[in-house]
């Protein structure tokens, strides 16, 4: 028990910090939609993961079939944009392989984060789109999706 307390006291802040919402990330990276291609790739990847997780949870919900029909298409478009950005940013195949592997790891990470948060929202609030999820969902729909067209 003492070891756990000592570890918690000395744990770096980044281990205890919650992830930034997309809105917060965008505020810290103001050129995300112009010259900052890595940020745009990261943001579109997170939007893709979020919409994929929403789609999975809405899949069997009869009342939410309209959302279910839209979410997978949006997820695919966000993933495609993220992939296209990192592919065009690389100068060789080796770079693309590294970026693809890194992207897969980010997808796994964010899928777990978003799925847990979506389930917590359902259990605690009776709805999926709430709190930080609502913030990210709105950012993806209002700020990110329009620049992909």
Task: Give residue spans per PLM region.
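Short N-proximal segments of mature Sec-exported proteins
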Residues: 33-93
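Short, charged/polar, low-complexity loop and linker segments
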Residues: 25-30
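Alpha-helix initiation and N-capping motif
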Residues: 1-3, 137
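Boundary at the C-terminal end of the N-terminal hydrophobic targeting segment
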Residues: 15-19
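Compact alpha-helical subdomains of small soluble proteins
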Residues: 75-149
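Sec-dependent N-terminal signal peptides
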Residues: 3-14
